[in-house]
Amino acid sequence: MKTKKKNLKNVLLDMSCSIMHHGHVRLIKRASKYGRLIISLTLDKDLIKYKKIKPELAFKYRKEILQSIKNVHKVIPGRYILDQKFLNKNKIDIVVQGSDYKNRQFKNKVITFPRTLSISSSKIRKLAAKNTLKKKILKI
């Protein structure tokens, strides 16, 4: 039996997605199985402040990429640090997160998935810088 769209839970996945990779895609696919997937995309200013990186792609381009993925219902601007007020305002039922955020506490149901091994935006950034100097093709 098909689930009625109006009965779907609002599922929030917060992401920086400074460099999109297959770990992000896998997380999006898994998260979307729990309901209507809403991605809270970290603002550029928060990436600079908290992660100490200037994103390779501006917020509007990262948003455009994420909105093109079929499992994504919508993408909303988000802060690096989520709080209960934000979840309530956006009517979130379930929070999905990677294991790197497992210590966060919310009133909502929280589902934590393990990270995809051997991949991260930081790792891609470091490999790209190293390989640019050597003029090699990036292999991950």
Question: Where in the sequence are the language-model features?
Answer:
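Nucleotidyltransferase catalytic core that binds NTPs
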Residues: 1-140
